[in-house]
Amino acid sequence: MASYAVLGATGNCGSALIQLLLQRPDASIHAFCRNKPKLIGLLPEIEKSERVTIYQGSIKDTDLLTACLRGRRAVFMVLSSNINEPGFRVGRDANKAVIEVLRTLHREDSGSTGPPPKIILLSSATLDDTLSRKTPYLLRQILHMSASHIYNDLAETEKLLRAEQEWLTTVFVKPGALSVDEQRGHALSFVESDNPVSYLDLAAAMIEAADDTTDKYDMKNIGVVNTNGAARFPTGTPLCIATGLLRHFVPSLHPYLP
């Protein structure tokens, strides 16, 4: 049975991943979250599913995280935010915890159960010159500033994971804008990312990268493109950009912004 862990299960990407994995009868899913009732509210079918185990708690709970990651083939790291919170470091903290747990498990197993699980990290095309080359320069700068604290966390997270590449494999999935919309069809790309892409298409792309056995995506930056039309424009984007810019230029306003 194909075994996966989803960290950040209650987010748009995490819930989309679980939704698609549930369609596969061979998938075993460990869902890590801080709020189990919220996750069940999003995906009621998982409450009685024998193929889904929910781990509720803090990413700093080493025993809980170890139980979640043990025996997994791939780990989807989809912990992020749409709020440009000053000092944001969820990605760094979570990935440090995951690296330490996987290192311990790797030493305990001594390779007897195969390589460590592959990390599939949700990042952003805005951080990659090639994948975002179709985005006008000025717009890209605005987007970067509007999520500067989040992107700084992502950049540092990527450094952490690349420093472990001798024993731990990561695929860096970098979509453009994301939208809550239906699944239309996707393709993985080394040279571009479309705007916008639905979370379901992003999730399908991440699963494809996790299941690849050729290693062609390992340690690479991967974009996601639409194959059957673009997703709907996310209507909350203008407000998200505006409040993100305020948090970038005047961080002290953060507690007072939506």
UniProtKB/Swiss-Prot annotation:
Keywords: Monooxygenase, Oxidoreductase. Oxidoreductase; part of the ergochrome gene cluster responsible for the typical purple-black color of the ergot sclerotia. The ergochrome gene cluster produces several ergot pigments including the yellow ergochrome secalonic acid and its derivatives, as well as the red anthraquinones endocrocin and clavorubin. The pathway begins with the synthesis of atrochrysone thioester by the polyketide synthase (PKS) CPUR_05437. The atrochrysone carboxyl ACP thioesterase CPUR_05436 then breaks the thioester bond and releases the atrochrysone carboxylic acid from CPUR_05437. GO terms for molecular function: monooxygenase activity. SUPFAM superfamilies: NAD(P)-binding Rossmann-fold domains. It holds the Pfam family NAD_binding_10. This is Oxidoreductase CPUR_05430. It comes from Claviceps purpurea (strain 20.1) (Ergot fungus). Its EC number is 1.1.1.-. Induction: Expression correlates with the formation of the sclerotia and thus the pigment production. Belongs to the avfA family. The keyword Metal-binding does not apply. It is an enzyme of class 1 (oxidoreductase).
